[in-house]
Amino acid sequence: MDSNTVSSFQVDCFLWHVRKQIVDQELGDAPFLDRLRRDQKSLRGRGSTLGLDIETATHVGKQIVEKILKEESDEALTMTMASTPASRYITDMTTEELSRDWFMLMPKQKVEGPLCIRIDQAIMDKNIMLKANFSVIFDRLETLILLRAFTEEGAIVGEISPLPSFPGHTIEDVKNAIGVLIGGLEWNDNTVRVSKTLQRFAWGSSNEDGGPPLTPKQKRKMARTTRSKVRRDKMAD
């Protein structure tokens, strides 16, 4: 096992512990709490994959951080902070929409790279809006926290979320997953729109009809998903 992978996990565990203390003292805002919950799931998945105990890793991570801070000067810290671009947290969804539990009548789940796509195949003939919470850097989507598909009545009918055991994803991963989700929803004659905020930071532009400007590759992926479903339906008949 790569030593850098282990030390990175150990430091992440300790930093999560520090952030948890901030929340316990009621010093964190909603986005801070949201990231804390998501990172907790990610750390559990990574710990299981690496075969490492989180509590032990947290103690080792503390030692690593303390050693770095002991050697770090205030001047070097200031220079590092000044030269590092800051991420922004974008919220399409309210805290209630983000944390709400939802259930599927006809569940369908698909893993697309490091992302998990869930869709309720029982939903038909609905107007659906895709909304997401994510971080942005250099005016481009950096990390997807959670994407959900809402009907006009406010019901959740689809979702894209990062896999806890597979940390890290690119903007292309997110766009490909959105293409698969849209293809699945449109198959049942639903009309799908993407929020202007998500269009802006994922594609750098927006369409008046709310449709994302998918690339030819993403359109082919949607077409393959549709053809595969047609074949399965014919076999079932």
From Swiss-Prot:
GO cellular component: host cell cytoplasm; host cell nucleus
Residues covered by region (Disordered): 204-237
Record field: compositional bias (Basic residues): 217-237
GO MF terms held by the record: protein serine/threonine kinase inhibitor activity; RNA binding
Keyword vocabulary terms for this entry: Eukaryotic host gene expression shutoff by virus, Host cytoplasm, Host gene expression shutoff by virus, Host mRNA suppression by virus, Host nucleus, Host-virus interaction, Inhibition of host innate immune response by virus, Inhibition of host interferon signaling pathway by virus, Inhibition of host PKR by virus, Inhibition of host pre-mRNA processing by virus, Inhibition of host RIG-I by virus, Inhibition of host RLR pathway by virus, Interferon antiviral system evasion, RNA-binding, Ubl conjugation, Viral immunoevasion
UniProt KW RNA-binding keyword: yes
Subunit structure: Homodimer. Interacts with host TRIM25 (via coiled coil); this interaction specifically inhibits TRIM25 multimerization and TRIM25-mediated RIGI CARD ubiquitination. Interacts with human EIF2AK2/PKR, CPSF4, IVNS1ABP and PABPN1.
Protein's name according to its UniProt entry: Non-structural protein 1
Organism: Influenza A virus (strain A/Memphis/110/1976 H3N2)
Name of the encoding gene: NS
